[in-house]
Each structure stands twice: as C-alpha cells, then as structure tokens.
UniProtKB/Swiss-Prot annotation:
CDD domains: ADP_GME_SDR_e (cd05248). Pathway: Nucleotide-sugar biosynthesis; ADP-L-glycero-beta-D-manno-heptose biosynthesis; ADP-L-glycero-beta-D-manno-heptose from D-glycero-beta-D-manno-heptose 7-phosphate: step 4/4. NADP(+) binds at residues 11-12, 32-33, 39, 54, 75-79, 92, 143, 169, 177. Substrate binds at N168, R179, H186, F200, G201, E202, Y203, R213, Y292. This is ADP-L-glycero-D-manno-heptose-6-epimerase. One of its GO terms (molecular function) is ADP-glyceromanno-heptose 6-epimerase activity. HAMAP family: Heptose_epimerase. It comes from the Bacteria. The active site is at Y139 (proton acceptor), K177 (proton acceptor). Binds 1 NADP(+) per subunit. It comes from Ralstonia nicotianae (strain ATCC BAA-1114 / GMI1000) (Ralstonia solanacearum).
Amino acid sequence: MTIIVTGAAGFIGANLVKGLNDRGETDIIAVDNLTRADKFRNLVDCEISDYLDKTEFVERFARGDFGKVRAIFHEGACSDTMETDGRYMMENNYRYTLALMKACLDQGVQFLYASSAATYGASDTFREDREFEKPLNVYGYSKFLFDQIVRRTLPGALSQIVGFRYFNVYGPREQHKGRMASVAFHNFNQFRTEGTVKLFGEYNGYPQGGQMRDFVSVEDVVKVNLFFFDHPDKSGIFNLGTGRAQPFNDIATTVVNTLREAEGKPALSTEELAQEGLVEYVKFPDALRGKYQCFTQADQGKLRAAGYSAPFLTVQEGVARYCRWLMAQPA
C-alpha cells in the first residue's frame, strides 16, 4: 500500500523516506514545496513513486485520488521559530494539518505528524501535559493548538493519530535549513571556515557553553516514527528526545575532536580546546535575554510506556557520526 510523506524533501521528511526505503518500501508519494529548489538534493538517493506540490495534495487526497493509503507521515510545516507572520504560520502549520488529519480519519489512514518541543516554551518541565505547555512564539503556538485538537479528537478516533514533540534534532540532510539548521551543523562549518567554534558565555546561572538542550539524532527520530508506524494501535502525543540534556560544550567538543581525529590529531578536553582558542565564548546577546531556553530535557515516561525501549544516541556518538557524514559530502 502507498505511504505518503509530506515535507519529503526537508530534513526529517527525507530521512523518513530513506528509512522507509531501507525497509524495502518504495511506493512512497513525496509531497513538498520546492520553491527552495535546492531541497531536491535530499531525495536524489531515495526511491519514490510520485511527487506532488503541497498546494494540490490535500484536496486530491481527500477525494481519494491515491487509492488505498496506509499511512501519512506529516513533516511539512514552517519550522522557522523566528517567523513573525502569524497568519502564514497558522494557515501552514495549523489549518493545513487539521485538514489532513480529518481526511486521514475519514479514510482510516494512519496519521503520524510532527509536533515540537516549542510547545513547552517557558516551562521548566517537559512532560506531555497541558499545564506544562507555555509556547513563546507563534510557531510553538501553532503546534500547541493542533495538539489540543488532537487531544479532543483521540477518544473518538478509529485510526491512529500520533504526534511527536521533536526536541533539538540534528543529522544528515539539514543543509538547506540555513539559520534553523542544528548547532552541530553550524559548529562544524564554523570550525572548518574559521578554525574555532563560538559559544555563548555564562548566562542565567549557567557557565560558559553550559546551557543545556536535549539533542537528538535524526536516526533516532526515524526509528521512533517507524516504531509507531509498525504499531497502528498506539496513538497519542509523545516527546521525542533522548531524555538526557547535554551542554553546548559537548556538541562543540565532539565536533572539533572529530575533525581533529580526521587529521590524525589527538582529542582534547573542552578546557584544553578553550585554552588553544579552538572554542571561544562570546557575551550572551542582550536581545536574547528573557527569551532563551537554557535547559530542555524530554520526559520519556510516556514514550517508554508505549513500548519503545531502544536506547538513544548520545551527543558524543551521534554528532561524531554526523560529522563523519558531513566530511564525506562533496564540497
């Protein structure tokens, strides 16, 4: 049966297409908006059966134009947390997703969609519960509002609905994202071009480079998506992070040491890298004061209770693997 991936040429979408291919699935309809044409590169090594623009897709799917569809992985959205056009954000992230979910429910199609840890915003607890959801921007609000609709819909739903609250995802196929690409991607390119990695200095009780996030490899993101794809009886909204906050220093140290290793140089500690000027700390920007999350860490209780038991890659494992992938890409 056909599988549909929206946002298929994007970061997580393209990795999902590749993950499905690795399982022998090739009857995949890719849906995206290729206004940013360079995204096509993410699909060059993937097998798909068709491509559609997002503007024509929902209406055609609701009409049943694609026959029997098993599942939709909905990764297509505006993921720019700095976007200030609320009307565009709500139309793209909320209304479009709502129409797609309704069409899936009408046809009994599994619906697996991208939510976001941005729904938690100013919270210091990251558990899938309404009391901890305090979005700070319209992107977070668009995801938050749709999650509320899902909660009201689930009791009467006759087919699977699963939302994944992605934390700080990094990994292959994100190069088109510009400023919204991961810290690992930016650290890698900064070190290659400037010979140093710059991190924020101390702020809000956290030491220099010590602000912490839940950094999760896209490899694990794909595995969790496919676990729920294989278990259509499981529905709900789930955090998708490692459950382990790590400091930005860990990202920078892993990036620099992986690049040093490729040159036959020994690994250095974070302190040694700073002493050598390979990691530098800059004053925390005034513009970000009061608007910056210094700590995120996924509560994995609900995910583990649903039966997902595989371990997650640490920064040291996942970022090193990602850097080696980046080094292998053509210039």
